[in-house]
């Protein structure tokens, strides 16, 4: 794996750590703060611009007790100052006291700005008939 691909994969991992920690502060550091960025959560409407995206994360974090990710099937491609990551989010979350396991296919697009990779696009789509792989 090339150096840029490694840095992008590390930033992608940090995105999921911020999500697991329900940390808007960590999430803020990972996103480009402009009006033309996009976020699509599974089953939600399109959010455009950092302020709307930030509010969507606050809503998710305030309504989530616990969430854990195991990321698999990761593909990283770098095209100059833009990178695309496609991965499977193997999610374990707590809903009404019950553990729920689900899968989401995600596309995360990053732009390199001042040697830092920032999210400019996140799209998650639920996997129908999800079967959790044998992972720990």
Label the predicted regions.
Residues 2-32, 36-136:
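A beta-strand edge to alpha-helix "cap/lid" segment located at domain peripheries
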């Amino acid at each position: 794996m090339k150096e840029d691909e490694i840095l992008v994969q590390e930033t992608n991992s940090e995105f999921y750590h911020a999500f697991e920690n329900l940390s808007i502060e960590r999430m803020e550091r990972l996103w480009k703060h402009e009006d033309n960025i996009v976020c699509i959560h599974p089953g939600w409407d399109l959010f455009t611009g950092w302020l709307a995206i930030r509010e969507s994360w606050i809503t998710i974090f305030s309504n989530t007790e616990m969430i854990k990710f195991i990321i698999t099937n990761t593909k990283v491609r770098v095209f100059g100052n833009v990178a695309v990551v496609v991965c499977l989010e193997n999610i374990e979350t707590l809903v009404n006291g019950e553990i729920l396991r689900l899968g989401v296919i995600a596309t995360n697009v990053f732009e390199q700005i001042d040697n830092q990779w920032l999210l400019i696009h996140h799209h998650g789509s639920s996997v129908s008939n999800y079967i959790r792989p044998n992972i720990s």
